[in-house]
């Protein structure tokens, strides 16, 4: 009873922090100058992390097993994983764009957990026989950590694509405007003002330099985080295969969850392969990561909607 009450309190605190965090996050998206608000949002993520840690420990204590037996608990662990990834750049006081991705991921995932959509799964139950194994912690935790890292890395790649294509569209529109107005009186007058041209060129060059630096940093950090996630995912799949052989007598059964996990692994293996070729780095590899981002959500969330296969104990119904 004490553990249940504590979990209830931590859930409400977490929900309050998430609500405040989402509000602050949306405000900082429109008003970049309010630095104090952004810092408050980041501290809110740390508070949410502590609450999630307390939730997981409390749930583990009164259920008697590691809390990764259904979608609700795995989403809790996913939020916790996002927060862990968030801690590294936060305490080093660098890479604010990485922290923006991880903090927003933590806030919105935890918001989904506390939204009430998964209320039927919040009550801890006795594990089904297939899950009563020491492999539960190893397999599921590695898979969820892998998903968290891959999602964060993929979102950095998405940010890279947005910046790159916005730049391409801007250049294209400027070329059209130049062709349209190249013989106008305003253009001729502008050409007669060399000082303005020099100032404008200097500003554009500086802006392009910082944009190029940002794209390069996004590309580098995306590659690092995805590489880490790929390692976690590989360990998770291998440990799951060993567990499946013990539980069902076969290392691989090609049920929907296993199939999409393999597709996810293959997609990010392709991503890492493209990184070995300098001609396919940056934008091309980011496109692969974006496709991987979609596939992860199909594997992690979409397959659970089917409620079929050997992993059907993690399914849920929206009603």
From Swiss-Prot:
The keyword Mitochondrion does not apply. It is a multi-pass membrane protein. One of its GO terms (biological process) is cytochrome complex assembly. It is found in: Plastid, Chloroplast thylakoid membrane. InterPro entries: Cyt_c_assembly, Cyt_c_biogenesis_CcsA, Cyt_c_biogenesis_CcsA/CcmC. GO terms for cellular component: chloroplast thylakoid membrane; plasma membrane. Keywords: Chloroplast, Cytochrome c-type biogenesis, Membrane, Plastid, Thylakoid, Transmembrane, Transmembrane helix. GO terms for molecular function: heme binding. The chain crosses the membrane at residues 9-29, 44-64, 71-91, 143-163, 225-245, 259-273, 286-306. The keyword Membrane applies. HAMAP family: CytC_CcsA (MF_01391). Required during biogenesis of c-type cytochromes (cytochrome c6 and cytochrome f) at the step of heme attachment. May interact with Ccs1. Belongs to the CcmF/CycK/Ccl1/NrfE/CcsA family. This is Cytochrome c biogenesis protein CcsA. It comes from Oenothera glazioviana. The gene is ccsA.
């Amino acid at each position: 009873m004490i553990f249940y009450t504590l979990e209830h309190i931590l859930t409400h605190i977490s929900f309050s922090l998430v609500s405040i965090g989402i509000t602050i996050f949306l405000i900082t998206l429109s008003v970049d100058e309010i630095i104090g608000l952004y810092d408050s949002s980041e501290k809110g993520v740390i508070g949410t992390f502590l609450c999630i840690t307390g939730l997981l420990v409390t749930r583990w204590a009164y259920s008697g097993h590691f809390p990764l037996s259904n979608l609700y608990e795995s989403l809790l662990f996913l939020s916790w994983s996002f927060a862990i990834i968030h801690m590294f750049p936060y305490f080093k006081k660098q890479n604010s764009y990485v922290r923006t991705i991880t903090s927003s991921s933590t806030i919105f995932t935890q918001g989904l957990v506390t939204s009430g959509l998964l209320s039927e799964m919040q009550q801890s139950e006795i594990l089904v026989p297939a899950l009563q194994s020491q492999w539960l912690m190893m397999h599921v935790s590695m898979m969820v950590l892998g998903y968290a890292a891959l999602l964060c890395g993929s979102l950095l790649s998405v940010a890279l694509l947005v910046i790159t294509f916005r730049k391409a569209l801007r250049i294209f529109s400027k070329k059209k405007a130049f062709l349209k107005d190249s013989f106008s009186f305003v253009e001729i007058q502008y050409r007669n003002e060399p000082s303005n041209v020099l100032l404008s060129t200097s500003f554009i060059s500086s802006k392009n330099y910082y944009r190029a630096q940002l794209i390069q940093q996004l590309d580098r950090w995306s590659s690092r985080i995805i590489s880490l996630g790929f390692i976690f995912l590989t360990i998770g799949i291998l440990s799951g295969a060993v567990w499946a052989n013990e539980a069902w007598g076969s290392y691989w059964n090609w049920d929907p969850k296993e199939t999409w996990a393999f597709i996810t692994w293959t997609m990010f293996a392709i991503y890492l392969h493209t990184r070995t070729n300098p001609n396919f780095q940056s934008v091309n590899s980011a496109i692969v990561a974006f496709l991987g981002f979609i596939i992860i959500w199909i594997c992690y969330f979409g397959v659970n909607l089917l409620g079929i296969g050997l992993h059907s104990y993690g399914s849920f119904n929206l009603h």
